């Protein structure tokens, strides 16, 4: 399944979550898109709830189904709970950590920065958004990319960097200091529903 490239607000409203990180797309119309307006949401079956939760998380991180399932299967081989491992693996993606550092305002924008070769990991250019960053590695902008308007705007408005990251706004450089705890990730997601979906 290809990655969705249409308007993110449609997905946000359909799934009831903000993909932009601002919540603005849900403020005026907190209901699914379509001609019927803010009618009552259809009650979902157990399968429907599981599918919806999977789609929420997949669209939140902006990955296609193949990448999503590959990471899910990888999480099963790690010690501990598969669902929690899965959430942590998604969080270690390079495009996500560029977003978390505040170098981009959305994950989609962060993915473009990586794709276009603006990002360095430990001093080497990495242009693969799914690259898995390890604790202790540094993430920085190439010197030639440090004057990008989108980066400057993002850094100016960003007021929060997770505790598992450190960030130097002057150098535009951050370090992934440790793996995150589950409690630090997406409280609105019930990963157990996703485990149940793939276990059917």
UniProtKB/Swiss-Prot annotation:
Keywords: Ribonucleoprotein, Ribosomal protein, RNA-binding, rRNA-binding
HAMAP family linked: Ribosomal_uS4_B
GO biological process assignments: ribosomal small subunit biogenesis; translation
SUPFAM superfamilies assigned: Alpha-L RNA-binding motif
Protein name listed in UniProt: Small ribosomal subunit protein uS4
Gene Ontology molecular function: any one: structural constituent of ribosome
Quaternary structure and interacting proteins, as annotated: Part of the 30S ribosomal subunit. Contacts protein S5. The interaction surface between S4 and S5 is involved in control of translational fidelity.
GO CC terms of this entry: small ribosomal subunit
InterPro entries given in the database record: Ribosomal_uS4, Ribosomal_uS4_bac-type, Ribosomal_uS4_CS, Ribosomal_uS4_N, S4_RNA-bd, S4_RNA-bd_sf
Residue ranges, annotated region (Disordered): 22-42
Pfam families reported in the protein's UniProt record: Ribosomal_S4, S4
Function: One of the primary rRNA binding proteins, it binds directly to 16S rRNA where it nucleates assembly of the body of the 30S subunit.
């Amino acid at each position: 399944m290809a990655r969705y490239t249409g308007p993110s607000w449609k997905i946000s409203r359909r799934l009831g979550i903000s993909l932009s990180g601002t919540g603005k797309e849900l403020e005026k119309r907190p209901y699914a898109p379509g001609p019927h307006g803010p009618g009552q949401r259809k009650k979902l079956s157990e399968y429907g709830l599981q599918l919806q939760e999977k789609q929420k998380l997949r669209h939140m991180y902006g990955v296609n189904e193949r990448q999503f399932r590959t990471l899910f299967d990888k999480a099963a081989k790690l010690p501990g709970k598969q669902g929690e491992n899965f959430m942590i693996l998604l969080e270690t993606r390079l495009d996500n950590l560029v977003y978390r550092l505040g170098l981009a305002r959305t994950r989609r924008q962060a993915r473009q920065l990586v794709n276009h070769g603006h990002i360095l990991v430990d001093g080497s250019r990495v242009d693969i958004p799914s690259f898995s960053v390890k604790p202790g590695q540094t993430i920085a902008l190439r010197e030639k990319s440090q004057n990008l308007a989108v980066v400057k705007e993002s850094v100016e408005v960003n007021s929060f960097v997770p505790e598992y990251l450190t960030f130097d706004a002057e150098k535009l450089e951050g370090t992934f200091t440790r793996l995150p705890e589950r409690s630090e990730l997406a409280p609105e997601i019930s990963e157990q529903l996703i485990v149940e979906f793939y276990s059917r």
